[in-house]
Every structure is written in C-alpha cells, then in structure tokens.
C-alpha cells in the first residue's frame, strides 16, 4: 500500500485529503508542521507528500528547501494544496509536481492527481 504524508494545519482539510487518499488505496498520515513532517518522513518514509503552502507559523517553502537538501528526499513527489494564489511553475524548482486549489478542487480531480503521483512512484 502506498503511503501519503499530508502536511496540513486545518483538520477539516486534512480529513478530506485523507479520504481522497483512501479512495485511491493509499494509507495517509497527517502532521501540522514542517518539523513534524521531517520527523514523520524519517520514521515512516512516505511515497509522496501533500503540502499546504500556508502553514501556521512557518512556511512550506522552508520544508520544500529542507527536502531538496537531502539527496534521498529530493525526488519525493510533492503535491501542493492551498487556498493561496500560487503558480505551479513557480513551485516546480522546489520539486512540486502538482497543485490542488482548495477553492475549486473537486474530489475526482484530487483522486486523479493522487493516482498519477502514486503511479509515478512504482
């Protein structure tokens, strides 16, 4: 079973994203900060990450930079999920492969992106 780490400080959104992960046959775990994410990555070794770009008290960009600085994590698939006005092309240098807009995201869109991410991690 594929493993998805969800870094999301809004419990409602974390629960929604966990449901989408389950729908594509993935096991999901959630954390609320970049520090917790790095600890979970070390201990659990997820196959992919979904990251809210606007974490309370810290920036997701700091986590993205941290991930890129580790050779064993640099290729970890990352999906950004946010209400923020962000452009996927601006995030690609940080290793982000997909972007989900919380304001307009449909369940089928999220499931399709999760499936695509996991198909690329075979």
Predicted regions and their residues:
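Acidic catalytic/metal-coordinating carboxylates
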Residues: 33, 59-62
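Short amphipathic alpha-helix used as the core "switch/output" element in two-component signaling
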Residues: 61-74
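Conserved acidic carboxylate
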Residues: 8, 82
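Alpha4 helix (beta4-alpha4-beta5 surface) of REC/receiver domains from two-component response regulators
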Residues: 61-62, 83-116
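Active-site residues of response regulator receiver
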Residues: 52
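The feature encodes the CheY-like receiver
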Residues: 56
């Amino acid at each position: 079973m594929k493993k998805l780490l969800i870094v999301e400080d809004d419990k409602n959104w974390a629960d929604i994203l966990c449901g989408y992960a389950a729908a594509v046959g993935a096991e999901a775990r959630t954390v609320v900060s970049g520090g917790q994410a790095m600890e979970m990555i070390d201990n659990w070794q997820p196959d992919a990450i979904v990251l809210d770009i606007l974490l309370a008290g810290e920036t997701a960009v700091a986590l993205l930079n941290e991930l890129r600085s580790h050779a064993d994590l640099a290729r970890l698939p990352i999906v950004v999920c946010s209400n923020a006005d962000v452009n996927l092309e601006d995030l690609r240098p940080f290793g982000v492969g997909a972007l989900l807009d919380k304001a307009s995201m449909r369940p089928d869109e999220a499931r399709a992106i999760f499936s695509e991410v996991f198909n690329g991690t075979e």
